């Protein structure tokens, strides 16, 4: 494949955009290449500026569960656009999507729409602090919750990719209120709670960690957190920006049967448009302005285009058998890639929850950030570039999740497994 046009555009972009991209992991820096510039997408495919075609397992980092340019979503957004793109005023669309979210998520009795996942987690933490009157928060190494100052401490996703989990520009006075435990370790949580008794406002985590690869919760981990939070008066927040409506219609909380006090959402609920949301128990959410004293606002919150795309997307997710079909395809692909690695004699540890999956370049179990960080990132980079040449587009980082969509066909899956089989032999 040739990437001449992408190289040219990247050179132009670097002169006027920091790093040449508007989100760091897109730069392909960790895989030692220049990024692809994408021209368009349709179904399971994306097409770059050099007219190369790729089977896409990034899916805009999760939102495109129906595939790209899903006709009903596109048509609904076009129709909505004819009435105006933004009003800065309430619309019926906000009520419709809010009710759909409430009906789906066990933890949500009231919900506030925002414009990004970062806004959602930032606002949820502020609300938890306001509700409890406590300052400290507890998060987990390798879990990424957006780029708010309080959460860029031992973070995953792009921060992990570039080896800087603590960002310059975050004052020590902010960071000192953020406690960090080890994912899947109740013992580390209990120690921090004991050391900071009565000071922790909330525990926030990805119930399925998706920003250090895909790391499922071990049996009893989520249940243990729920019990600890109840006993200590701590707000339990599930960051389901990635897992919400992805691993199940009711998110990870529905899949695992553990109900948090608050939930943050994004990605899928906007159908590919910028969106976020946070919700939870009525008694907590009513502390939010204008009904309460905890302030939060946004010019484009509840944007009608995003609400429309979200409504249309969720309608299709409700169809009988949707998640069963997605599960079957995801299982086939994940197992096929694992088998291809084994047949090539290549060490690999595969994980999957629903349509989220990851191939870790290590022979050892991955269950937290320490074990994820031990992966062979150089081998992953070789694999990534080889797969790209075979027309398979993966996230350009070992520490990201791959996503299946409803648009991926049996032919796509078979072609991807065949490409993986070839690439594992090449990089061995």
From Swiss-Prot:
Molecular-function GO terms, alphabetical: glutamate-1-semialdehyde 2,1-aminomutase activity; pyridoxal phosphate binding; transaminase activity
Record key words, sorted: Cytoplasm, Isomerase, Porphyrin biosynthesis, Pyridoxal phosphate
Record's subunit section: Homodimer.
EC number annotated for this UniProt entry: 5.4.3.8
The keyword Cytoplasm belongs to this UniProt entry's keyword annotation: yes
Family classification: Belongs to the class-III pyridoxal-phosphate-dependent aminotransferase family. HemL subfamily.
A GO biological-process term: protoporphyrinogen IX biosynthetic process
List of residues that carry N6-(pyridoxal phosphate)lysine: 267
HAMAP family the UniProt entry points to: HemL_aminotrans_3
Disulfide pairings: none
Catalytic activity line of the entry: (S)-4-amino-5-oxopentanoate = 5-aminolevulinate
Any matching Pfam family: Aminotran_3
Name under which the protein is recorded: Glutamate-1-semialdehyde 2,1-aminomutase
Enzyme class: isomerase
Cofactor(s) listed in the protein's UniProt record: pyridoxal 5'-phosphate
Localization annotation: Cytoplasm
Coarse class of the protein's main subcellular location: cytoplasm
Pathway(s) the chain acts in: Porphyrin-containing compound metabolism; protoporphyrin-IX biosynthesis; 5-aminolevulinate from L-glutamyl-tRNA(Glu): step 2/2
Domain of life of the organism encoding this protein: Bacteria
Record-level GO cellular component terms: cytoplasm
